[in-house]
Swiss-Prot record:
Chain segments annotated as coiled-coil in the UniProt record: none
An example Gene Ontology molecular-function term: phosphate transmembrane transporter activity
Organism: Buchnera aphidicola subsp. Schizaphis graminum (strain Sg)
Reaction(s) catalysed by this chain's protein: phosphate(in) + H(+)(in) = phosphate(out) + H(+)(out)
Subcellular location per the Swiss-Prot or TrEMBL entry: Cell membrane
Gene Ontology CC terms: plasma membrane
Residue ranges of the TM segments: 13-33, 52-72, 94-114, 124-144, 155-175, 207-227, 233-253, 373-393, 421-441, 470-490
Protein name (Swiss-Prot/TrEMBL): Low-affinity inorganic phosphate transporter
Cited function: Low-affinity inorganic phosphate transporter.
Lineage of producing organism: Bacteria, Pseudomonadati, Pseudomonadota, Gammaproteobacteria, Enterobacterales
Length: 493
């Protein structure tokens, strides 16, 4: 980590330090902004004290980041077009980084101040889109290319549909609990609010088994949040470092000799595959282009040329430190290009399952060179997220716990909301899909209460929906405006 500050230009080192500070601030805000969702149900059902719930949530957020992998992280990195990320000069890269971070932080703090559980994920993704769009307008390039449409479509679909899925699943769980437990003795207890239990039975705490279920489901939400949102923080920091300190982060400089040889072997196998299937792929390309606009730039001969260039670049290389900065840029570009081509090849109609499995594995293997994160990055993101969880959580907790439904949550509603959220976010993290913890859990709470017939507070739902609708466009406009102003300032000075 210390080599980041070894630049001869003191200003550059200071800017890197400031960028790191901004990213960690964003992640800490994410902690107390989003993780409040995980502790709100515990606190308002009196399953644990507020302090215990927050500390426990912070701990499992930390573990979620450490053990969650990197699939979501690089879904965030790839939202920014590669040419913008790799071709920016240092001043433009700094403008891009600070505009993006400032926009996301300002919106997150604003919604937190007004007690609105808005999505940190939406604000980050919106800020990245704003940079890409503004750059396209300034450089008079394609807006479609600036949006990286295939990646953007997948992210948008996940962010839009995940709350709907949360509402439906949570409501269904309430229905199932009522159906299967109606003949059990004391089944009514799970459908009581803490206040009702205190008034009827004189006890403040939930029954033991219900308490354990609430704690475990809350742990699940915290861990899943760390795995998904923590990965976004890792992706954001890698995006920043690739932009302003590319020499050390374009490729994994810590890759072992064995790993590099494995990458080279994978490239060789891909060359053999494409050479062997030349006629089939060229024929299928012509047919596929008639029905699939996304592969209009697919060219078999360009793929072969790219593979040959990669093979040549890696000749006699057993340590990526042997590559100079230009060669590292080229290697990253070649591997990303090849990865996109593999994705397109997989969707050809005459590619059999065995070939698809080979191509998917090959893509995963070559991306290990560029889709990585040093352990110190994972650790500081985990620490920032967990520390953020332990401060500033009260404002959002009040909204989730008291203002969504017309009455306080029952134990069953809390459990169904948390189980839904932990499963949904966990699956999304495993599959590399960035989702919003805030929207999944708040919609799960609403779904549980609607299923129970308790009703919801329309005014609060309107405010949450308004924050949901505004987050993307506002963060897009903010980051785009900041980027434009910063570039003007750089140009004039």
């Amino acid at each position: 980590m210390l080599y980041l500050f070894s630049y001869s230009d003191l200003n550059h080192s200071l800017f890197i330090l400031l960028a790191l500070f901004f990213v960690l601030c964003y992640e800490a805000i994410n902690g107390f902004h989003d993780t409040a969702n995980a502790v709100s149900t515990l606190i308002y059902t009196r399953a644990t004290s507020a302090h215990f719930a927050v500390i426990m949530s912070g701990l499992f957020n930390f573990l979620g980041v450490l053990l969650g992998g990197l699939t979501v992280a690089y879904a965030i990195v790839h939202l920014l077009p590669n040419d913008l990320l790799l071709n920016s000069n240092s001043k433009n890269a700094l403008a891009m980084v600070f505009s993006m971070l400032l926009a996301a932080i300002l919106w997150n703090l604003s919604t937190w101040y007004f007690c609105l559980p808005a999505s940190s994920s939406h604000s980050l993704i919106g800020a990245i889109i704003g940079i890409g769009l503004t750059n396209a307008i300034i450089t008079d390039s394609s807006l479609l290319h600036a949006l990286n449409v295939p990646k953007m479509t997948n992210v948008f679909l996940s962010l839009i549909f995940s709350p709907i899925v949360g509402l439906i699943i949570s409501g269904s769980l309430i229905f199932l609990l009522r159906f299967f437990l109606k003949k059990k003795k004391n089944h009514y207890r799970i459908h009581m609010t803490p206040l009702e239990r205190e008034q009827k039975e004189g006890k403040k705490k939930p029954p033991f088994l219900i308490k354990i279920a609430l704690i475990l489901s809350s742990i699940g939400v915290s861990y899943a949040h760390g795995a998904n949102d923590g990965q976004k923080g890792i992706g954001l920091l890698m995006l920043v470092l690739i932009g302003i300190a590319p020499c050390g982060f374009l490729v994994n400089l810590n890759a072992s000799k064995k790993e590099i040889i494995y990458t080279k072997n994978t490239i060789d196998h891909l060359y053999e595959y494409y050479s062997k299937n030349k006629v089939k792929i060229i024929k299928n390309t012509k047919n596929q282009k008639k029905i699939d606009f996304s592969i209009k730039n697919y060219n078999y001969f360009e793929i072969i040329k790219n593979i040959k260039k990669t093979k040549f670049l890696l000749q006699n290389i057993y340590d990526f430190n042997q590559l100079n900065i230009k060669q590292r840029f080229k290697l990253r570009h070649f591997l990303l290009f090849l990865s996109e081509n593999i994705d397109q090849t997989i969707h050809f109609s005459n590619i059999v399952k065995k070939e698809k499995d080979f191509l998917k594995k090959s893509k995963k293997d070559i991306l290990k060179t560029i889709e990585y994160a040093p352990m110190w990055i994972i650790l500081i993101i985990a620490l920032s997220l967990s520390v953020g969880t332990m401060i500033g959580w009260k404002r959002i907790v009040v909204t989730i716990g008291e203002k969504i439904g017309k009455k306080r949550m029952t134990y069953a509603q809390a459990m169904s909301a948390q189980i839904t959220a932990s499963l949904s976010i966990g699956i999304a993290s495993y599959t590399g899909i960035p989702v919003s913890t805030t929207h999944i859990l708040s919609s799960s709470v609403a779904g549980a209460m609607l299923s129970d017939g308790d009703g919801i507070q329309i005014s609060t739902i309107k405010n949450i929906a308004l924050a949901w609708i505004l987050t993307l466009p506002v963060s897009i406009l903010l980051s785009g405006f900041f980027y434009w102003i910063t570039l003007l300032f750089i140009k004039n000075f």
